[in-house]
Design a protein with these regions (language model features):
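Short helix/loop capping segments that flank catalytic or ligand/cofactor-binding pockets
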Residues: 2-4, 29, 54-56, 167-171
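Glycine-rich anion-binding loop/nest that anchors nucleotide
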Residues: 1, 22, 46-48, 179-182
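Short helix-loop-beta junction
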Residues: 2-19, 176-177
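Terminal amphipathic helices with adjacent charged low-complexity linkers/tails
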Residues: 14, 19-134
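Cofactor-binding active-site loop characterized by glycine-rich and histidine/acidic residues
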Residues: 129-184
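Short secondary-structure junctions and interdomain/linker hinges
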Residues: 6, 10, 48, 65, ...
Length: 184
């Protein structure tokens, strides 16, 4: 979806050397398929929600490849540039270099922004870069229009009148109560 939102159809992706690999089972990552997919690529952008399960396995699988054939693997963190010692966790504040967030869902717009950023970093023809910029501007305008307004009122939890749980919060004398979830 993110590629289509950026105006990158199958032919354009093929011309740019963009390949997709949808992993069916994330653990363990199938080594032979992974190596076949990675062969000939300069960079791999791993798109996965939450923790870097696939990204770390991919880095480990390709770790011993010669530097001239091993693709740069990115996902949660962006490229730190030449000469940066260590990995992303060697930084004082690794979240300052986030590419795809790990703490929430990844919308097509967020993924599209990451793809566009990486494509522009590795270099694409000027017409495609202009297309990426135009499409991103439209997506950012839509995101701005859909921003959640700041809540001014404080909403306290409560039970609806007539709710059977309302009386269940009162503990009879001599009884003990345990914590539990409620519908409030």
């Amino acid at each position: 979806q993110a590629l289509l939102d950026l105006g990158l159809d199958d032919d354009t992706c093929r011309r740019l050397g963009i390949r997709l690999h949808k992993v069916g089972v994330v653990w363990p990552l199938e080594a032979q398929i992974t190596r076949e997919f990675a062969t000939g690529l300069r960079e791999i952008l791993v798109v996965e929600e939450k923790r870097q399960v696939i990204e770390y396995q991919l880095k480990e699988e390709l770790y011993n490849w010669r530097a001239d054939v091993r693709p740069n693997i990115l996902g949660k963190f962006n490229d730190m540039g030449e000469g940066h010692p260590g990995g992303e966790w060697s930084m004082a504040n690794p979240t300052a270099n986030t590419l795809l967030r790990a703490n929430a869902d990844l919308s097509p717009a967020l993924i599209a922004a990451a793809i566009a950023q990486r494509l522009k970093a590795i270099g694409v023809p000027g017409d495609i870069e202009a297309r990426l910029d135009a499409r991103l501007a439209v997506m950012q305008a839509k995101d701005s229009a859909m921003q959640v307004l700041e809540v001014k009122a404080d909403r306290q939890p409560w039970f609806c009148s007539g709710c059977p749980h309302n009386t269940s919060t009162k503990v009879p004398e001599g009884s003990r109560a345990m914590a539990g979830i409620g519908c409030h």
